[in-house]
Amino acid sequence: MRRLRVGKVVEQTLAPRDRALPLAAHADEAVGRLRFALIYVVLMAVLWATVVDDLLAAWLATLPLAEGATTLTLYSPYDWLETRWTAVGLLALLSSLPVLGWQAWRFAYPGLLPSERTWLATYIAVGGVLTLFLILFIWGWMFPRMISAAEIAVTIEGVGLHYDVVALFQMALAMSWLLLLVALAVLALALARMLG
């Protein structure tokens, strides 16, 4: 490595293959990659917005509700709009994970050491697959089982069960974020430990 003196204040250490670029060049690259990723997420959101009602209806149909769809209640139309757009955002982010991961990798690659590259590549790949698996697991298997268990535990004679659609969605979404953040944090720590 050689020492490069930039001005009279800053001193950097560069590897032989490194190039000294001004901070503005890095900022321009970051803005360009963020712009591309944002446009991609917005396009995915537009696509998901066209089918979100059908997807939510299909998901609600998979839930083991006591007496079927007649037990679903919508207490606030504005909350339902928020729910729909939250679902669109979640689906857009999930379907954009490969592009977001690729953009992060391409931006970070030149500045990383080989061990850091291995860690980041593994984290992006395993984290992306883990994220998709956890979301499918929570929404498709875990949440319906929780509703079944709750129905068995709370049966009061003469009292009908009614479910707030927005509350069901918000609870599934909260579980998703909680388990996802814990899983990604554990993955980051495990990879840091394994790869040094």
Locate each region found by the language model:
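Membrane topogenic/interface segments and analogous intrinsically disordered interaction regions
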Residues: 1-196
